[in-house]
Amino acid sequence: MECRMISQFLIAAPSSGSGKTTVSRGLMALLIKKGLKVQPFKCGPDYIDTKYHTAVCRRPSINLDTFMASAGHVKELYARYATGADACITEGMMGMYDGYDRDRGSSAEVAGLLNLPVILVVDAKSAAYSVAPLLSGCLLYTSPSPRDYA
């Protein structure tokens, strides 16, 4: 059996309205243009962004919702739909650490559960040096209720 590495990452942001969907769709389109099979995913129960993903990728975008589903089910969904893809792009929701009960159901929780590297999208409009501590905080922040993802 051939084992191949696939590119996979999660697109997150410090808040909603930062451009996650625009960046996600742009990366999906670029990778498809380069001949890759891209599997889209979306954190949470969102059904609008998944329609955009599906239109670009011509594959169903799958919701990864750790609030409504068990960690095991989310892992199973990810593994099932990632099969056969060259790249998996997961779009986060809201702010990276925003969820139901602090971080429960957050993009950070999904990234930790699936061991996905995170690409952080920051809207730096009307800012300059102030973006640096924002980025630093996102890198160094530890969830207030860490979970065991084993």
Regions found by a protein language model. Name each.
Residues 141-150:
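Single conserved hydrophobic/aromatic residue that forms the stacking wall/gate
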Residues 2-18, 22, 28-114, 122-139:
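ATP-dependent carboxylate-amine ligase catalytic core
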